[in-house]
């Protein structure tokens, strides 16, 4: 199920502890577009849209531009930007006309924030956060962990043992992210997953019920989110014959997962096998292959040399 994320100015303010210097009563405004914009065209009089839906930033470039004009003209130009009703305006330490902006802001319901960051720092911090929050999200049924530092989502039919397997892996020192309902964001060709808010911090163990993970196993065994690099699909015995398993494993198998090509392993769930050990081995194999070493290729090379 695909859903679109929502983001409000208040979330950005709290996340980055921003200093709201005007109109703090209006931080419930919605940010509906990614990116932090520098309104060069608009300041020059080229109004491309009737409204601005993303954050506006004023810094040294805008200050240098305004230096050419009188205070009256600066006020008119800033007024035109405010008329476009952006959800939030941020100005940096090098913006020398903040006084005019703050005076104008009294007539509008647009929150104004002062920061010490440069525009480029904002792009790496605040804009990355906004992009994640506003990206298209899909709700996936699975269990998400970080195994040897690699984000792995366990999938399979209900009752195949995903949650129980997650507990085994955590006891081996790996990290839990979420169980059952996983929100997956697609950002720049990569997938990032986290637990859906209603199930965050909980895990369902068949026969025991719902458990609070951090209280049961420790908050240090959890992280909020991880980049997803591998999908591991657990297969029940009845389905084994329908799957064509790779015998040598010369290449990493991939599948389209949420319109992204991602490493994919089928692992048969058979009584007596340690599935957690096999998953650790799969992750090790993946890391070796992506670093340039291939066990299967070396094995085949040795067989060919011996003429077997």
UniProtKB/Swiss-Prot annotation:
Ligand binding (Mg(2+)): 163, 204
Positions bound to ATP: 156-163
Cofactor field: Mg(2+)
Complex formation: Homohexamer.
Protein name: HPr kinase/phosphorylase
Residue span of region Important for the catalytic mechanism of both phosphorylation and dephosphorylation: 203-212
Keyword terms, alphabetized: ATP-binding, Carbohydrate metabolism, Kinase, Magnesium, Metal-binding, Multifunctional enzyme, Nucleotide-binding, Serine/threonine-protein kinase, Transferase
Keyword Iron recorded: no
Region named Important for the catalytic mechanism of dephosphorylation: 268-273
Species this chain originates from: Ureaplasma parvum serovar 3 (strain ATCC 700970)
Stored PANTHER family: HPR KINASE_PHOSPHORYLASE (PTHR30305:SF1), PROTEIN YJDM-RELATED (PTHR30305)
NCBIfam families named among the record's database cross-references: hpr-ser
Keyword DNA-binding attached: no
Active-site residues annotated for this sequence: 141, 162, 180, 247
Family: Belongs to the HPrK/P family.
Misc. comment: Both phosphorylation and phosphorolysis are carried out by the same active site and suggest a common mechanism for both reactions.
Gene name in the database record: hprK
Functional description taken from the UniProt entry: Catalyzes the ATP- as well as the pyrophosphate-dependent phosphorylation of a specific serine residue in HPr, a phosphocarrier protein of the phosphoenolpyruvate-dependent sugar phosphotransferase system (PTS). HprK/P also catalyzes the pyrophosphate-producing, inorganic phosphate-dependent dephosphorylation (phosphorolysis) of seryl-phosphorylated HPr (P-Ser-HPr).
Record-level Gene Ontology MF annotations: ATP binding; magnesium ion binding; phosphorelay sensor kinase activity; protein serine/threonine kinase activity; protein serine/threonine/tyrosine kinase activity
GO annotation, biological process: regulation of carbohydrate metabolic process
